[in-house]
Amino acid sequence: MTTLTISIIVVFVLGYALIATESLTKVNKAAIALLMLVGCWTLYMVDPMQYLQMMHPDYTGGAAGMVEKVTGIIQEHLGETATTLFFLMGAMTIVEIVDQNGGFNWVRKVMKTKSKRALLWRIAFLTFFLSAILDNLTTSIVMIMILRKLVTDHKDRMIYASLVIIAANSGGAFSPIGDVTTIMLWNKGLITAAGVIAEIFIPSVVSMVIPALILQAMLKGELVMHEVSALQNASVSDFTEGQRKAVFWLGVGGLIFVPIFKSITHLPPFVGILLVLGVLWTATEVFYRSLHRGQDAEGTQKRVTKLLSRVDMSTILFFLGILMAVSCLAEIGVLTALGQGLNVAFDGNHYLVTGIIGVLSSIVDNVPLVAGCMGMYPVAAVGDMAVDGIFWQLLAYCAGVGGSMLIVGSAAGVVVMGLEKITFGWYMKHISWIAFVGYLAGIVSYWLIRTFLYAV
């Protein structure tokens, strides 16, 4: 490993440490993430040829075409990152439109209970199954908006929000369309829909239920009901009950439609999100036009043009910085070398290798880790490396669920961190060990299933 490579890693680790201590430094994590992005790629440009020769052996342009090649590489990574950012912005805007126009009101009535623990279990299972249909990012945004309608105490809401992260990641792990890593494995033909659902469903449930059992001990008594519910109801009286339900189904139903749209058109998911946003935007404009409210300020504030200003841009920029910094680590070969080193260190023990990959996925982006594994290990005709083999199914589980161990370890965690202002330190102190226990319990349950139910 060269001095330059070590320097890039040091910049990443230092930036990560500053993000982890945001509550102490009082420096916004988005600012640090952007500095990580610039720092890593600036160091990369000190001597990019060594990395081009290592990671792109087909490159023959020499020094003359080096800058153009690196520019193309950065643009490729930026394009991949942008699809995530546009998806996130679209999903956040859709949920904001539904929320501000009263679309979640009837959902709140269905979920409403005075018991804190009863609400915890309703939130857990709704998040779990919703995440299997949607992606865990969109599910987290939806559930946080619902929680804000139900829970006024921020300390309690942080506990519920933490469970949303765990349940969203667990729910996405057993579904071929629930998480970007399972989509990658499914599209590559390494797992089948029937196989991953049959064998990963129970471990995923276990990885969610165990933390929920522990977290419910932190919640005692009854919820404080909203004293301003009448005022809140009045604030959404612009739309009729039918219009509010139409907004809900156009928004949430549209989000559910996104994976279907992707499978039909083969276009990236963000295109489907923009389709849903366009349809919902048009519908609300038609509804508001029919109200004839003139220059009513309150009604104007709920129109999409105003709601766009409510999108949390610091979260978007944080995503940009983190994903692009991690892409630099991928380009210098660190992630691939890490995967190969694990395989050698643990002598090919699939449970240990994938288990460690899961832990690592809570530190760095799981997408390049999974991509590295897909590139390192060839598919076998039979055995643990075959389609639906132990390795690939464990990889789907560990890469998905492992991200719950740190709040920045998954897209769900990052967006909840931004929406609910949960600090890295608080999550690590109170939630990380709980998520780790659930993670290990899920792996054990998978071992039991493979050993006793599917043993040949």
Predicted feature locations:
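Alpha-helical transmembrane segments
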Residues: 79-89, 195-213, 265-278, 392-402
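Transmembrane helical segments that form the transport core of multi-pass membrane transport proteins
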Residues: 60, 79, 101, 108-110, ...
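Transmembrane alpha-helical segments of multi-pass membrane transport proteins and ion-pumping complexes
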Residues: 41, 84, 88, 92, ...
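Hydrophobic mid-bilayer segments of alpha-helices in multi-pass membrane transport proteins
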Residues: 6-15, 26-62, 81-93, 244-254, ...
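Transmembrane alpha-helix boundary signature
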Residues: 43-76, 92-109, 129-141, 328, ...
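Juxtamembrane and boundary regions of transmembrane helices in multi-pass small-molecule transporters
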Residues: 4-7, 153-154, 158, 174-175, ...
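Membrane-interfacial helix-loop connectors
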Residues: 40-51, 78-79, 130-167, 171, ...
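Interfacial loop-to-helix junctions that mark the boundaries of transmembrane helices
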Residues: 1-4, 24-27, 55-58, 67-84, ...
